[in-house]
Amino acid sequence: MKKRLSWDEYFLAQAELVAQRSSCDRAQVGAVITVDRSVIATGYNGGVAGLENCDEDGHKLEDGHCIRTVHAEMNAILQCARNGHAMNGATIYVTHYPCLNCMKSLAQAGVKRIVYRNDYRMHAFAEEIARLKGIKIVRLERSKE
């Protein structure tokens, strides 16, 4: 009999599915925000709504980073704001480690736990912010089964 998914595996698998909506061909990133094991928002990286996406008009690169995109974490945070969902104490499941700006926003929004799969732009100050704010960070390896 197949082993049942843990909650972390379950929600991270959802983030990986959400990432498939990304319009970026450089990195498809997905995020799922939960409170008490209930999904309150999802997000993926892509252009500003109503404007051209990378897959339509190309990348706008600065310092090796595409500035056209809104990151998955930010889209999920903004979805919470639009729909009136408080994030205090929330967990975010994200396919890639949050960049510095996303880490600052997650800390400010009250996220207390980040579960991710892939390392990405592991900024030392992002890690320090998480430590100082008491945010638990978990890297979840892909199951071998």
Where are these regions (language model features)?
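Zinc-dependent deaminase catalytic domain
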Residues: 1-145
